[in-house]
Structures are given as structure tokens and as C-alpha cells.
Amino acid sequence: MKKLILSIFLCCGLTTNIMAQNENEPFKGYYYNDEYNIYLKIDLHSDGLIVPEHEIFGKLPGYLGKKYNSFYWLITTKDIKNKKKAIVEFINDYGSEDLEASLSKKEDGTIILKQLNGSDLKVPNNGKWQKIPKEITLKKK
């Protein structure tokens, strides 16, 4: 009986801890957009993400990638304004284009990526460059 009660308290404590982490780190996770087959992997609260097959860049706060492709837009700088908004700067993995964007966290857990200044966000698609809209919604996975 004591083990059962202890187990229940531990489970409740872990659940509360996990929920608190999500509230304290709103700009962390994996977000995707099925229409353009792109995803955003971010941890703006630390510089701890390694871009697959691009380890030479070291640890970064995040990156935007395309499914089934090794092309990336790397997040080089971040500025968390509050729990619902952050400003980030991207550079493509060739270093030839860069842009500034805002990330807005919505109540349903989605993120709105809005391009502010700089180059257009483009990703490879069937041998051509596909422009991503200036504002796009990414769902949390």
C-alpha cells in the first residue's frame, strides 16, 4: 500500500515538473508544416542543438529543415521577447543568404514564423527552389 501511494505521488510530481518545463521554455521543440514539408527544431533557451550532417557549425539554438533533404536554415541569433514572441536570425547552410524572422507562440501550441527582413526563405523542392510564404504556421509534434 505504501508503494502504491508513493508511486502515485511520484507520477503526479513528474507530470507537474514536465508541465512546468513546457511553460518555462515555450520556444523549445519540434514543429512542422505538412504543406511545405518543412520543420523547425528549436531550443531558444540554450544553444544545444546539433544540425544533422552539419556538425561543423557546432551547437545552435535551432534550425529549419526540409523533410528528405539535407539543406538547412540555421538560427544564429535569438532574442526571446516574452513567453509568446521571439526574434531570430537565420542563415542558410551555404552562408549566402540570411533573414530575420519573428516566432509567435499561440495558445494551441503552434508557432507562427513571420519573415521580417532579409532574403526570402526558400527550400529545395524537386530540383527547384520553393519560396515559403512570408508567414507560415508550424504545428508542434
Set out the residue ranges of the language-model regions:
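Bacterial Sec-dependent N-terminal signal peptides
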Residues: M1-E23
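Basic side chains
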Residues: K2-K3, N17, K105, K131-K134, ...
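Central antiparallel beta-sheet cores of small beta-barrel/beta-sandwich binding domains
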Residues: N22-E100, D120-K141
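Extended Gly/Ser/Thr-rich low-complexity repeat segments
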Residues: D98-G109
